Amino acid sequence: MQQIRSALTLFNGISGLHLALDKAQIKVDKVYYSEIDKFANKVTEQHFPNDIPLGDVTKWREWDIDWTTVDLVSAGFPCQSWSVAGKQLGDKDERGMLFWTTLDIIKTVLEHNPKAKFLMENVKMKKDFEQYITYHTEQSLGKVEKILINSALVSAQNRNRYYWTNFEVTQPEDKGQVLIDILEYPMDEKFNLSDASVSRFKMYDKPKGNCVGTTKLEGRIGQRDECYGVNGKMGCLTATMYKQPPQYVVHGGAIRGRYNEDGTISQRLELNGTEKTNTLTTVQKDNVVVYNDTQYRKLTPIECERLQTVPDNWTACLSNTQRYKSLGNGWTIDVIVHILKCAYK
């Protein structure tokens, strides 16, 4: 078993790094974490009560850390200002500026321990932003390896993320997991959508490959305008029936507000054409499940945990609302496990 002295995890969330270290069978003597979300911290306190909280990442110069012992530092720095789904302000807003804070902290770690390894993560973004982050990371930290990994390789969820490291990372093997593999049985009716809600939805008839529809305005980009199935590598799936009884045809989709010809907006249930879910977000209506051809329901919190390859009930200490949010903000753990195994061969 590999062993490291201490790990520092920035923007810790629900302790994805520590969980991944455990799953990768890498022993760590001490974990420092920075996180200001009280609900995410509640999950950490339940599972890793001995981990050391540091509070606000912007106050890092006040932290009481033995920097010389930090062998690994991770940072999934906030994505809102870099994502195509956001305002794309980059480091021109407060959250985007945390990229520079991240570089300062990692640089400090490397100054005290040049052999330390780092891992930075963020969303798939426009090329200019990706190049900007890569360039300034190299200027600050030295040679950087960058890779884009889709969580669809290790889970039933499409989730493209960039990872920047100071060690080589390969693509994980495709586990071939699809939506039906992670669904809870029997179906809990409390997650069904009401008949009144379903009656308002309009489905697209002919999916175009993996994308079943769009309301994209000219010059606009981003996932919120495109409609994918939650059953393949990002879209509407017909799951293999033998894998899980009862034998439902399962589709994934999302509820989207769409413009009608008269300028009004309707809520439409849009199916994706594959066997993967859409990317988990903090918005519950971004992922729904269709089964028995007539019933529609949301993904359950446990199903969202499975999509993120987190153990069942990992977030059970939270309300369902906070579970959806924390999981949508989190990492796909098996991707991080793969990256750690590349770091500590």
Walk through the language-model features, giving the residues of each:
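Conserved active-site and SAM-binding loop architecture
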Residues: 1-345
